[in-house]
C-alpha cells in the first residue's frame, strides 16, 4: 500500500509521528520517502540521531508550521499521502491560548487541505479525537471544525483523484497529553481522582492508533 510512496506527516516529531515512522520503516522497506514536518528543531535532531541518514536515506526533515500556508505547499510537492497529526491538543493549553489553538487546529487543517489539492496528493488522513463529539471545550470544538473541513473537502475536490479521511481516537496510551501519566502520578500520591462516577474512558495503545491509520 505504501511501498514506493512519498508520505508527509505533519506533527511528525510527536508521539504518534515517531511510532508511525518506526512502523513504516519496519513494514514498508520500499517506501520512497517519509517527510517529517514539524516546527520542533530539537525533536527533529533527536530523530535524525535515532535514524542516521546513511542507514535511512528515505527520511527527510522539514521545519515548518501548518499555520504557514506557503510552507505547507512547499512541503507537499511530490507527496502521495499526508498524515495530518499536528495539533494543539492539551485541553488546558487550548483554553489559555485560544487564538493559537484555532490557528493551528482549524486554519492549519485548511492549509493542509488546500496544499493537498494544489499539489496533487492522493490520500489525506487527519487524526482527530472523541472530544470532537459534542465538544465541551475549545480543543474538542476546534477538532470538530477540523473534521468537518476534511469531510467537506471530498465535495470540493472536483475531478481530482484525492481522498480525505478522518480517524477519531479515544485516549491514546503512551502519547503526550494522555491521562495515563496523570493517573500514574496520582497513584504514587495515594489518591486517584474520578471526574464522574459514571464516566467511561476509551483507551487504545499508540500502536493501535498507528494501525488504524495504515
Segments (PLM) and residue ranges:
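Conserved Rossmann-fold cofactor-binding substructure of NAD(P)-dependent oxidoreductases
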Residues: 60-81
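Rossmann-fold scaffold of SDR-type NAD(P)-dependent oxidoreductases
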Residues: 10, 76-85, 126
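N-terminal Rossmann NAD(P)H-binding glycine-rich loop of SDR-like oxidoreductase domains
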Residues: 5-26
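Conserved Rossmann-fold NAD(P)-dependent oxidoreductase catalytic core, especially the SDR/UDP-sugar
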Residues: 84, 88-148, 152, 164
Amino acid at each position: 500500500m505504501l511501498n514506493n510512496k512519498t508520505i508527509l506527516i505533519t506533527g511528525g516529531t510527536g508521539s504518534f509521528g515517531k511510532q508511525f515512522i518506526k512502523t513504516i520503516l519496519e513494514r514498508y522497506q520500499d517506501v520512497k520517502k517519509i517527510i517529517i514536518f514539524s516546527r520542533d528543531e530539537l525533536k527533529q535532531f533527536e530523530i535524525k540521531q535515532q535514524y542516521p541518514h546513511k542507514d535511512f536515506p528515505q527520511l527527510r526533515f522539514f521545519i515548518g508550521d501548518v499555520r504557514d500556508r506557503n510552507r505547507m505547499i512547499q512541503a507537499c510537492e511530490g507527496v502521495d499521502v499526508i498524515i495530518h497529526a499536528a495539533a494543539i491538543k492539551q485541553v488546558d493549553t487550548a483554553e489559555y491560548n485560544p487564538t493559537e489553538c484555532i490557528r493551528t487546529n482549524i486554519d492549519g487543517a485548511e492549509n493542509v487541505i488546500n496544499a493537498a489539492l494544489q499539489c496533487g496528493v492522493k490520500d489525506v488522513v487527519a487524526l482527530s479525537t472523541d472530544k470532537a463529539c459534542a465538544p465541551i471545550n475549545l480543543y474538542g470544538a476546534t477538532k470538530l471544525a477540523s473534521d468537518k473541513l476534511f469531510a467537506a473537502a471530498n465535495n470540493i475536490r472536483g475531478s481530482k483523484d484525492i481522498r480525505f479521511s478522518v480517524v477519531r481516537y479515544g485516549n491514546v496510551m503512551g502519547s503526550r497529553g494522555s491521562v495515563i501519566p496523570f493517573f500514574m502520578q496520582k497513584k504514587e500520591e495515594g489518591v486517584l481522582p474520578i471526574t464522574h462516577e459514571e464516566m467511561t474512558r476509551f483507551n487504545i495503545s499508540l500502536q493501535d492508533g498507528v494501525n488504524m491509520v495504515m
